[in-house]
Amino acid sequence: MSEHDVESNKKDDGFQSSVTVEMSKDPDSFHEETVEPKPELKEPEPKEPEPKEPERKEPERKEPERKEPERKEPERKVPGRRETQTKETQTTEIERKETKKKRGTNSYCPPQGTINKTITDGAALIALWTLLWALIGQEVLPGGNLFGLVVIFYSAFLGGKILEFIKIPVVPPLPPLIGMLLAGFTIRNVPIIYEFVHIPTTWSSALRNTALTIILVRAGLGLDPQALKHLKGVCLRLSFGPCFLEACSAALFSHFIMNFPWQWGFLLGFVLGAVSPAVVVPNMLMLQENGYGVEKGIPTLLVAASSMDDIVAITGFNTFLSIVFSSGSVISNILSSLRDVLIGVLVGIVMGVFVQYFPSGDQERLTQRRAFLVLSMCISAVLGCQHIGLHGSGGLVTLVLSFMAAKRWAEEKVGIQKIVANTWNVFQPLLFGLVGTEVSVESLESKTIGMCLATLGLALSVRILSTFVLMSFANFRFKEKVFIALSWIPKATVQAVLGPLALETARVMAPHLEGYAKAVMTVAFLAILITAPNGALLIGILGPKILEQSEVTFPLKVELSNFHH
């Protein structure tokens, strides 16, 4: 229907209504007024509106809908931009095709994608290195401290990436930290490379303490009070029991096998007592996504307890570290360690209350400000406590501060966790690379390795057995208890921090105790190398076979799901 016909129809309607009204009033006036519109009625052919009148009555309201496409016709004319855009896209596609034709068979010149990104990053790195060389000088040249740090970082990073690319069918992926550890070990035991890699003790100590701080911050932010209340006794038994029993058994076995003093034995025990969330959490999340063990909450239990287990181990290590390197009596050492714990808790509460209200919620870039404030305050607390001799206080300050802040922020802490996780991604290659550089093949004797393996194996056996027994009081089947016990053996990050920390403290404060510290370092290295890949394989293989599979109707909300340390 054309616009002219529509207008004529409207006029017809108006004319008929006027006719009916005027007839009711005055028929004479009707005859007079009808004379004028008659020529207008004859213009649009009278035969067309008559059959269309019933159509007009029903879809009168639909006519404006039919007019919409008619109204869009001028809009199509106006936005010729779309036509120009389509023409531009066509021309760009034609240009791309022409460029591809010009390239011919040599389609990789200039390169695209990953190769292009790698070349770009390399050029930026060279430019940055040139700038640092102009500012610092010899530090960035081979043999300098910064040069060695960069070599270790990139070697460990590449080692982790290479291990990620190695995929074996039917076998779960291996943790990248093993590749980082082996990269540092390779640098240490290749004389040509290690000749140019020198890192001062103060640098490595500061880096390890910073990595430890990030671990504790992530642990504090990741603690979920609701999950802990829901799991209650089971989570507490799994967090405290195996760690304490493994520490005591390691102290006992190292005392009789390796001739360790009792203080050093307990220090070694708390180094070994921590489980690695870097191995446990990703594998638990994979099982959870497929519905394995979700009905009984096994993934939730292991994820929540892994963080608490690390906290117990680090606190025990700091306590015995202060006991080992102090010259007082046993009673005075115990009192000083309790003093450190009390100071750490009180300072952490005060700083945690401050962080809850500062910065306020009306500030810009609130997430970045909060993350920076928490990290800077925690790192300052750890390094400052180390400097003044309160070895057991810094970690507790960090833990209490981050936990109180997370409790106040609730769901807003997710963005802060992501920032802290990105910070950890930078320090992780440095940490494991530095651990690898501390282990020299020349200094290792077969007898020493045998004693370390014996102590490690016996302590792990006690841990597995104690975990199984402690889970007997929960509502788990026999196979599920076996799975939980075997899932509780991987060790990685905490051992990478605490093992070298004891060695560096011995070098600075008591060089005559360096032999014990090297033995602790060796046991920590072997624990990472043996338990991390084997633990990942056991979890990935036994999980689908042992745990019951159920339909996942909703995602499991666990705050520690981003915990990758």
Swiss-Prot record:
Annotated Basic and acidic residues bias: 1-14, 23-86
Membrane topology category: Multi-pass membrane protein
InterPro entries per UniProt: Cation/H_exchanger_TM (IPR006153), CPA1_transporter (IPR051843)
MF terms in GO: antiporter activity
GO biological process: flagellated sperm motility; proton transmembrane transport; regulation of intracellular pH; single fertilization; sodium ion transport
Phenotype upon loss of function: Mice are normal but males shown reduced fertility caused by diminished sperm motility. Addition of cAMP analogs almost completely rescue the motility and infertility phenotypes in vitro. Double knockout of SLC9B1 and SLC9B2 results in male infertility with a severe sperm mobility reduction, indicating that these two gene are functionally redundant.
UniProt keyword Transport present: yes
Keyword Ribosomal protein among record annotations: no
Main location, first listed in the record: membrane
Subcellular location: Cell projection, Cilium, Flagellum membrane
Tissue specificity: Testis-specific. Expressed in the spermatids and spermatozoa (at protein level). Specifically present in the principal piece of sperm tail (at protein level).
One Pfam family from the record: Na_H_Exchanger
TM spans (from-to): 122-142, 146-166, 167-187, 206-223, 238-258, 266-286, 311-331, 341-361, 371-391, 419-439, 449-469, 482-502, 523-543
Family as reported in the entry's similarity comment: Belongs to the monovalent cation:proton antiporter 1 (CPA1) transporter (TC 2.A.36) family.
Its biological purpose: Sperm-specific Na(+)/H(+) exchanger involved in intracellular pH regulation of spermatozoa. Involved in sperm motility and fertility.
Cited PANTHER family: PTHR31102, SLC9B1-LIKE PROTEIN SLC9B1P1-RELATED
Name of the featured protein: Sodium/hydrogen exchanger 9B1
Protein source organism: Mus musculus
